[in-house]
């Protein structure tokens, strides 16, 4: 069929109007979805109920970390393959952030108040420093006498403490790393040291021993040394992994093998236990707009899960200062 000019113009107008109409409809649907998502964000979420944040198997079975930056992004090691760090938004969108140098495999991650990322590199016997803007990775500290630096915590003066287990001998030790990269051995003859955290006032270091199921406290001296070691809790079963404080000083401890996170007072009183949708939670951090979202790395399903808490995390609070 041959169209006359007038007919061609008429059909062009109809086609244009139809296209614009469909485009407008699509935009309306997208806007409606955004409004629904915003409404869901404003709706109060139940406390201490875990839900998935990322899809299963986006990380390896070595998923660990995790830590939040000032913008609310969550970082965890071993995204898609070993020796990487992944970045996850608070809506669960995950992507590769950086590849670590050859011979390095990350474990615990911490941020300084200045926004520096520090990573425990257990295969390279290093503590790495990552520039968030440039993604440049450098070695802050290297110590051949480290078994395998596992987790990190940061004190108010900016110095780091690293746990250092020897899984074969079921022993462990603790190291202090100053801001210039100087390394000092601060505790020996311990069990398999793993999760550790500094109290809100900066005067106490907590550390757990995975195999022995102990949680210890040390007094931190003015020079950063550790003294007055004391047992605050011994558990009867299952192992430990990562550990973090909220602003009140309560400890959140991942129970590896039990599939829970325990909330415990500094005196060792168990306040509650939260199931986390997998049997092998490896670590925990706090973030979200109000600091009241806990993010847990979960090894069984190789993903991050999240749950709401009643008080902000300590690391989040430090971002606000």
How should each PLM-predicted stretch be described?
Residues 84-86, 126-128, 173-175, 214-216, ...:
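A short loop-to-beta-strand structural motif that recurs across blades of beta-propeller domains
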Residues 88-92, 131-135, 177-181, 220-224, ...:
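Short loop/turn segments that connect beta-strands within beta-propeller blades
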Residues 76-96:
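Beta-propeller domains
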Residues 2-14:
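Bacterial N-terminal signal peptides that target proteins for export
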Residues 37-59, 229:
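A short helix->beta-strand "capping" segment at the edge of beta-propeller domains
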Residues 11-24:
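Bacterial N-terminal signal peptides
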Residues 95-99, 138-142, 185-188, 227-233, ...:
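Beta-propeller fold detector
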């Amino acid at each position: 069929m041959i169209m006359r000019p007038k007919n061609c113009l008429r059909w062009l107008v109809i086609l244009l109007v139809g296209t614009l109409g469909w485009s407008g409809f699509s935009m309306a649907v997208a806007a409606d979805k955004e409004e629904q998502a915003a409404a869901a964000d404003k709706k109060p979420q139940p406390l201490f109920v875990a839900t998935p944040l990322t899809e299963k198997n986006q990380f390896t079975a070595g998923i660990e970390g995790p830590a939040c930056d000032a913008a609310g992004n969550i970082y965890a090691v071993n995204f898609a393959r070993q020796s990487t760090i992944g970045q996850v938004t608070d809506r669960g969108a995950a992507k590769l952030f950086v590849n670590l140098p050859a011979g390095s495999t990350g474990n615990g991650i911490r941020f300084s108040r200045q926004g520096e990322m520090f990573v425990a590199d257990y295969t390279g016997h290093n503590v790495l420093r990552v520039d968030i803007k440039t993604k440049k990775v450098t070695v802050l500290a290297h110590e051949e006498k480290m078994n395998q630096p596992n987790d990190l915590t940061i004190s108010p003066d900016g110095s780091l403490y690293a746990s250092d287990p020897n899984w074969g001998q079921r022993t462990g030790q603790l190291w202090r790393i100053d801001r210039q990269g100087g390394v000092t051995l601060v505790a020996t003859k311990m069990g398999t040291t793993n999760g550790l955290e500094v109290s809100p006032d900066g005067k106490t270091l907590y550390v757990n021993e995975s195999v022995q199921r102990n949680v210890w406290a040390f007094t931190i001296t003015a020079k950063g040394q550790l003294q007055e070691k004391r047992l605050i809790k011994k558990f009867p079963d299952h192992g430990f992994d990562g550990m973090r404080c909220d602003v009140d000083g309560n400890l959140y401890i991942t129970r590896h093998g039990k599939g829970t996170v325990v909330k415990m007072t500094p005196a060792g009183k168990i306040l509650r236990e939260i199931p986390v949708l997998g049997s092998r939670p490896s670590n925990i951090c706090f973030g979200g707009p109000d600091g009241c979202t806990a993010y847990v790395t979960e090894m069984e399903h190789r993903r991050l899960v999240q749950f709401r808490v009643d008080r902000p995390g300590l690391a989040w609070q430090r971002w606000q200062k």
